[in-house]
Regions:
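EAL-family c-di-GMP phosphodiesterase catalytic domain
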Residues: 1-5, 16-20, 30-33, 111-115, ...
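Histidine/lysine/aspartate-rich catalytic loop segments that bind and position anionic ligands
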Residues: 127-164
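Short beta-strand/loop segments at the ligand-binding rim of alpha/beta enzyme cores
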Residues: 104, 124-138, 183-192
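Short, basic/aromatic recognition patches
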Residues: 1-11, 54-58
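Catalytic core of bacterial c-di-GMP phosphodiesterases, primarily the EAL and HD-GYP domains
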Residues: 54-120
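A general structural detector for well-ordered alpha-helical segments in enzyme core domains, enriched
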Residues: 91-98, 120-128, 151, 175-182, ...
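A cross-family glycoside hydrolase active-site/sugar-binding cleft signature
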Residues: 9-11, 76-80, 108-110, 136-138, ...
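A short, well-structured catalytic beta-strand-centered motif of the EAL phosphodiesterase domain
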Residues: 7-44
Length: 226
């Protein structure tokens, strides 16, 4: 990718009771040659059509995100199992080395949309854990997400996807609460994403979430490379 075509936004990860920043999630941002923004979802959809390119871009992004991370805080970075699966051995080794040298880093394994990809995701979780890295399962509750008991057993962090905030009936709330209890009983942490209002923050506290993220705290973001 050409210089100046991407940057990193470090979105704050907040302890919801004290409303203090305890870490950041590194989010890739992209622009066209004319400077106009490109949604990250659109960019990654295009990259998935060329898995080898996806793997190379992922390595470059992770290098930028880790080398420019805010000091003395925990860093959450996303890793797509497809990019891992299609990485050359040398690139995969470099990526693991970057993550290991990155200090307090949690690797978020992005949920996938079919069973074959879910198996790749499970294997990625196992590889990361074997290297002593902390692992988060991203987007729990997503409509088209999949997860395995093996991945759940190994995860250090469970992240709940934002759309459940807008469709949290009694039954779904009970399921989320059961996940939170399970996480705490096994020593894992929970994160609620998509917190946009004070009411969302109050809900996170009521659900006993450990951490939150979202637009409500956008003014605390750190931007590098724009």
């Amino acid at each position: 990718m050409g210089a100046g075509r991407y940057w990193t936004e470090y979105e704050p990860v907040i302890e919801p009771r004290s409303v203090t920043v305890v870490g950041y999630e590194a989010l890739a941002r992209f622009r066209k040659p004319d400077g106009s923004p490109v949604p990250a979802s659109s960019m990654f959809a295009l990259l998935h059509a060329d898995p080898a390119l996806l793997a190379r871009v992922e390595l470059e992004l992770k290098r930028h995100q880790i080398e420019n991370r805010p000091a003395d805080t925990e860093l959450f970075v996303n890793l797509d199992p497809d990019s891992w699966f299609h990485s050359k051995p040398a690139d995969a080794g470099e990526l693991l080395g970057l993550l290991k040298r990155g200090g307090r880093t949690v690797v978020e394994v992005i949920e996938n949309m079919d069973a074959a990809d879910a198996l790749v995701g499970r294997d990625l979780v196992t590889t990361l854990k074997a290297r002593g890295l902390s692992v988060a399962l991203d987007d729990l509750g997503a409509t088209n997400g999949l997860f395995s008991f093996e991945a759940l057993e190994q995860a250090d962090v469970f992240k709940f996807e934002r759309s459940f905030l807008r469709r949290l009936g009694d039954r779904r709330k009970a399921i989320v609460q059961a996940f939170v209890r399970m996480a705490h009983e096994t020593g894992a942490r929970t994160v609620m994403e998509g917190v946009e209002t004070e009411a969302d923050l109050d809900l996170a506290v009521a659900l006993e979430m450990d951490l939150v993220q979202g637009h409500l705290f956008r003014d605390r973001s750190v931007v590098v490379g724009r």
